[in-house]
């Protein structure tokens, strides 16, 4: 069983566990999938919160505020007596009265062409979540989860969340939604949790604690992007011994397959025998020259080659024969001495990729996720045409620091998958998840339209500066491209090794605008190379191109911990969390975080041209809903 935990945006099915399920099913291994994030939100917004009219409570009703906190909605699953809704404030009563309509409207297209109604719907749902009666230290939103007492970057706090799952807002869902799913069949031999965002961490560990109590013999496997980043930090260790049986860094397909093949009777280490067969915590033996990446984290060595295939979008790359580890698994090439790309990455014209023999690739399986589970005007199909990044030169990029190889799929594989998935899902939108869609992939899509609107992240290149090519992209279904401009100052871009020329960026924005493709532009302020004047040049660039920029994401730079030693900057601990991925630093130009925040609040977000872009950028769901806004 594979589970996607809360909290992340409940607008599209989880691609990670769908990819794993597709691979396992192709190898003859059955696998159940649960999107506990979207199911959890559906439970919180469920029948327990309904009422017929203002002042007339529903069957479960509402109750007024606990002392010291604003009025709250009664938690699903509780048995507190009904209270009159007139005790609630006007906003909450209105939000409750319109709850069904908001949920219905967010699943239909017309709302996305009405910005005021859309913002009201999102704000009202956020109000309801804010008023649910959990601990006052908890702030729950549609895309975020914060706890004033527990930090997602402190392992002891994650263990505390696991020790008291009843304190988590999703605990009623664990009891009434998740537990019955596990009870209908025999307990699974293993449960995999896919943890990708910090907003998921505390809820994921609360869920793990709940599952460990209910199913002590079941093996718990924890993987995903966030876990990979944790394990690939210098001197990484396993802080969850005794709670989590396996930590998986990097792609988990081979690990899970070997686990399924070698699990025997399904006995967890320290558990009780559940039937015949051998104890399955024994490591699969093979002479693979394993070297420790860190204490109790192991990585296999691979025979790597570089393959240049001009007939495909990319070359295949899939690991093979991965052993099962007792504690942690990593496919980290840096630790094992694996051959790979040079540190400076491939050049702009590079078309090849690292490749492994014995290519195995499977189509993701989204059949377990009904479209009505998600807050979107139609099913969204998430799809990865490649793992890693074809550029791999940007300073402070984790793809380079973690030595993630570029692992693309061939053209025929991409189009075969998309053809199959569009027939199965009838999607309203395809979301390409690639870190950066390669020029070859974009060209292939321009030549072979997939018949469904699509969007994704792309680098600013000469290819996108060509008006004719952009028109072909639009004709192929491209609705929006996300562009990491980062800065409007050429010196800053060069210092970051972005490979972006501002003159080219200008032509790209105008070409996309002329073709009818929305540009979702990402800006990053406070980098070590930036000062106030450089930041002002960014503001000037954005203002000058404001009519060509559809949406904006404005972020404050954080220095990754992996870059601290080589940055040449004076650094200090960003937080006391042992799992923190960032450090604080003394800005070499005196451009402190406090000054940057003031600049963003005063000169950036209040600039009339930029403020207009921010107003049309969807709140909370941001780039996930922006394509629907762009389609009008």
Which residue stretches match the model-derived regions?
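Conserved SAM/AdoMet-binding glycine-rich loop
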Residues: 1-4, 217-221, 415-519, 525
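Glycine-rich beta-alpha loop elements in corrinoid/cobalamin-binding modules
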Residues: 7-51, 60-81, 114, 121, ...
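Conserved, mostly hydrophobic/aromatic
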Residues: 24, 389, 483
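A structural motif corresponding to the C-terminal end of an alpha-helix
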Residues: 27-29, 185, 424-425, 508-519, ...
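Active-site-proximal loop/turn and secondary-structure-junction residues that shape catalytic pockets
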Residues: 197, 226-228, 401, 436-438, ...
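Canonical Radical SAM [4Fe-4S] cluster-binding loop centered on the CxxxCxxC motif
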Residues: 375-412
């Amino acid at each position: 069983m594979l589970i996607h935990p809360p909290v992340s945006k409940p607008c599209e099915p989880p691609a990670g566990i769908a990819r794993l399920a597709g691979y396992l099913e192709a190898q003859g291994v059955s696998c159940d999938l649960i999107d506990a994030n979207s199911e959890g939100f559906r439970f919180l917004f469920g029948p327990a919160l309904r009422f017929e009219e203002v002042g007339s409570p529903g069957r479960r009703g509402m109750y007024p505020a606990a002392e010291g906190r604003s009025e709250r909605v009664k938690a699903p699953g509780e048995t507190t007596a009904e209270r009159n809704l007139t005790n609630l404030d006007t906003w909450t009563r209105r939000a409750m009265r319109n709850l069904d309509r908001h949920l219905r409207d967010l699943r239909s297209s017309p709302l996305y062409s009405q910005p005021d109604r859309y913002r009201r719907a999102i704000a009202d749902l956020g109000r309801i979540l804010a008023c649910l009666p959990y601990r006052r230290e908890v702030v729950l939103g549609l895309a975020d989860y914060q706890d004033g007492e527990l930090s997602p970057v402190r392992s002891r706090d994650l263990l505390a969340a696991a020790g008291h799952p009843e304190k988590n807002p999703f605990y009623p869902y664990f009891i009434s939604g998740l537990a019955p799913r596990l009870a209908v069949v025999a307990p699974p031999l293993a449960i995999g949790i896919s943890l990708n965002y910090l907003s998921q961490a505390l809820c994921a560990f609360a869920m793990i604690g709940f599952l460990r109590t209910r199913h002590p013999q079941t093996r718990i496997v924890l993987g995903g992007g966030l876990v990979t980043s944790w394990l690939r930090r210098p001197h990484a260790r396993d802080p969850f011994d005794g709670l989590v049986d396996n930590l998986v860094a990097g792609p988990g397909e081979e690990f899970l397959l070997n686990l399924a093949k070698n699990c025997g009777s399904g006995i967890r280490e320290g558990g009780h025998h559940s039937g015949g067969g051998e104890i399955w915590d024994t490591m699969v033996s093979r002479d693979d020259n394993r070297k420790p990446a860190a204490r109790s984290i192991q990585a296999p060595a691979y025979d790597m080659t570089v393959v240049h295939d001009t007939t495909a979008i990319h070359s295949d790359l899939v690991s093979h024969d991965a052993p099962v580890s007792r504690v942690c698994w990593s496919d980290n090439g840096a630790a094992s001495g694996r051959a790979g790309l040079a540190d400076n990455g491939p050049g702009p014209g590079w078309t090849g990729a690292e490749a492994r023999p014995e290519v195995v690739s499977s189509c993701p399986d989204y059949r377990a996720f009904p479209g009505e589970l998600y807050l979107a005007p139609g099913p969204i199909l998430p799809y990865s045409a490649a793992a890693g990044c074809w550029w791999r030169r940007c300073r402070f990029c984790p793809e380079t620091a973690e030595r993630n190889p570029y692992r693309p799929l061939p053209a025929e594989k991409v189009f075969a998958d998309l053809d199959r998935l569009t027939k199965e899902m009838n999607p309203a939108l395809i979301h390409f998840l690639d870190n950066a869609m390669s020029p070859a992939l974009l060209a292939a899509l321009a030549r072979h339209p997939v018949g469904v609107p699509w969007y994704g992240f792309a680098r600013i290149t000469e290819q996108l500066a060509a008006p004719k090519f952009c028109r072909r992209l639009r004709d192929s279904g491209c609705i929006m491209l996300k562009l990491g401009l980062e800065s409007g100052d050429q010196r800053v871009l060069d210092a970051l090794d972005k490979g972006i020329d501002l003159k080219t960026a200008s032509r790209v924005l105008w070409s996309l605008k002329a073709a009818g493709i929305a540009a979702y532009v990402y800006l990053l302020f406070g980098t070590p190379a930036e000062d106030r004047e450089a930041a002002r040049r960014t503001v000037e660039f954005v203002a000058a191109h404001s009519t060509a920029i559809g949406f904006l994401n404005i972020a404050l730079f954080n220095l990754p911990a992996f870059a601290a030693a080589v940055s040449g900057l004076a650094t200090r601990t960003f937080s006391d969390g042992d799992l923190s991925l960032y450090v604080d630093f003394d800005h070499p130009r005196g451009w402190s975080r406090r000054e940057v925040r003031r600049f963003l609040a005063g000169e950036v977000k209040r600039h009339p041209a930029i403020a207009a872009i921010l107003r049309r950028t969807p709140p909370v769901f941001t780039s996930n809903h922006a394509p629907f806004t762009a389609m009008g």
